[in-house]
Amino acid sequence: VLEFPDLQGIAGAHYARHDGELESVATAVEEHYWPRFSGDQLPSSPEASAVALADRLDTLVGIFGIGQAPTGSKDPFALRRGAVAVIRLLVDLDTQLNLSDLAERAAQEYPNDTLAPDTAAAVTNYTLDRFRSWYEDQNIAVEVLRAVLATGITGPAEVNRRVSALNAFAGTEAAIALAAANKRVANILNKSGQARAGIP
């Protein structure tokens, strides 16, 4: 939308109502562009959220698939904003939907050999990495997010639940005692020459 971007989706909603579409359809036409920027409101209905999610994932997979992923400060297709929107939508829906599965499903809509190999995995990793800035805005340490992502889960709602729980635990005396005990065990193992277990 190059002219009147503030009206994006609004005209479509009016057309949908004029054509006799259900109100839920008209609402989804308007609200699937939400959130439009950081901190913007989310869609008010499951239908609008579903379309918003599908639209963002299609864009991410399509642009990544042709090798136009953001680099450095360049993000001409606003993919960072789109990825954060995907996270916010999935967390808000509080669903068990798996980001990896959703990216794979979006990639399947493209003809064979259209996308670069591992496009879905690249989109998944990129989107999960956007959690970092999202949590920084909430003053949650990046180490908390890394600890959660080290478990291999890719469902944003589950990631958010675990980050919230771990962040709450991290400030307790029990967490401090656990960290101290872990450090002592690591020092003992290092001095004895034994390899540490693969614990992140």
How does the language model describe each region?
Residues 1-200:
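Amphipathic alpha-helical "coupling" segments that flank catalytic cores
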